[in-house]
């Protein structure tokens, strides 16, 4: 499993993830890159779930971004429709977090496209821990940057969740929101 966190604050949007890949109860890799930039560096995307499935979804999402000239919401809705109705895609087990300067979204295989409250996404096995940490930091420390909130939340999740480590990949964009 994994932990992915995205935070919007003070004109920035940040997305980060840990690097652990597990097979059952065994750590197979500790430095996987689960967050990346798509569509000419304008979109951040991260995944939780089966790695091979996530790469398929990244590829499909990037195709939708190209098809819709980088329009994040439209591309997300079209991917969710395909994911739900295409027989081969419907068996994929992963979730995507995507963000650009305007919006942050979670895309699921159930056809859900959700824009979370507070500009905060936290998902994966350590998502609950990371969400609690990030919300506390956002509500009680106005001086921390989006990057500092995301990094701290991921490190806290990595210290609690056995399927999350503290080898982080963090990407950042300027935000319109």
Swiss-Prot record:
Main location: cytoplasm
Subcellular location field: Cytoplasm
GO terms under biological process: proteolysis involved in protein catabolic process
UniProt xrefs under SUPFAM superfamilies: N-terminal nucleophile aminohydrolases (Ntn hydrolases) (SSF56235)
Keyword Manganese found: no
Single GO molecular function: metal ion binding
Keyword Translocase: no
Enzyme class: hydrolase
This enzyme's EC code(s): 3.4.25.2
Family statement drawn from the similarity comment of this UniProt entry: Belongs to the peptidase T1B family. HslV subfamily.
Main function: Protease subunit of a proteasome-like degradation complex believed to be a general protein degrading machinery.
NCBIfam families recorded: ATP_dep_HslV, PRK05456.1
HAMAP family: HslV
Record's protein name: ATP-dependent protease subunit HslV
Recorded name of the encoding gene: hslV
